[in-house]
């Protein structure tokens, strides 16, 4: 079928499919599209194919459908089928990349171990760091890809001769938080065609392109955690990690008993099953003692945090006086002004200008307004030094 953009598709010029490789026309450019089986990546593949690019679809098989992973999850059999169906209908090749073993080792096992350490992990970032932007990019090069395109809602621009990431234009769909660990070398190979579009417009494009997945709901869960039931996944995959322990107040009083620290996250208020004259929150998870520490909201808020494995886009040396940044501590949270100083070897200290909830295992992602600077993993310095 011949693709002719309608006025609705142009969206006042925001649909920008300029040559993905400078100086190389579409018909000579091979684009490997990371297809999850969802609407966004399917639209990317369809638009590039109809624009004349040599498109190859690639879908990662990350897990089998099982009680632990769930049948309704991303990168499972249903999603692979949907991606193959889109590729077959449009007429471009599609490959399935079996990363089940490495995904279990580097993402699921890390997820389990993170909870055992009393952290709150972000497996989607770990997946980006490993199977998606390490292994998949390697496979894309091996099959002759010039670039890899994804359905992420971020913008890729060149600033002062360096490739940079800007937040997606749609603030409700911006995914820059999850890409803080992308390296400068990987970014040279990546393309994000949807960064200037709103999700509603992408849905409209899918309908106008008659894609079979046009009405497919967005995935809301961690791909191997169906219906956000991560506790069930932990019980199935590592039963020994779920054991009873004490709930204590920050002042040392014993308040009750818990059925596993993996059932709690820092900042949690509901589900503590203890009575008190004022609201109590999870302030800290002491994995060494298998103890949940709770207290008033004032004990929860912090002005400083510590990060490790810092990644910068592009590579950057923090001035000795520190660097003023906008810091985001949650994927859906607002940014706060902060200053980061280097502690050497990829470690840093971030001082916030506002009180915030700080959860070890989450990411502290750094921005200069719209521009993604990089980020690192929040860690408990006392536990780290005592390890």
Swiss-Prot record:
Site (Interaction with tRNA): 152, 362
Keyword ATP-binding: yes
Principal localisation: cytoplasm
The entry's keywords: ATP-binding, Cytoplasm, Disulfide bond, Nucleotide-binding, RNA-binding, Transferase, tRNA processing, tRNA-binding
Region: Interaction with tRNA, residue numbers: 173-175
Cell compartments where the protein resides: Cytoplasm
Record's catalysed reaction(s): S-sulfanyl-L-cysteinyl-[protein] + uridine(34) in tRNA + AH2 + ATP = 2-thiouridine(34) in tRNA + L-cysteinyl-[protein] + A + AMP + diphosphate + H(+)
Membrane-spanning intervals of the chain: none
Active site, UniProt feature: 127, 223
E.C. number: 2.8.1.13
Binding-site residues for ATP, renumbered to this chain: 34-41, 60, 151
GO MF annotations, alphabetized: ATP binding; tRNA binding; tRNA-uridine 2-sulfurtransferase activity
InterPro entries in alphabetical order: MnmA-like (IPR004506), MnmA-like_C (IPR046885), MnmA-like_central (IPR046884), MnmA-like_central_sf (IPR023382), Rossmann-like_a/b/a_fold (IPR014729)
Known function: Catalyzes the 2-thiolation of uridine at the wobble position (U34) of tRNA, leading to the formation of s(2)U34.
UniProt name for this protein: tRNA-specific 2-thiouridylase MnmA
Designated gene of the protein: mnmA
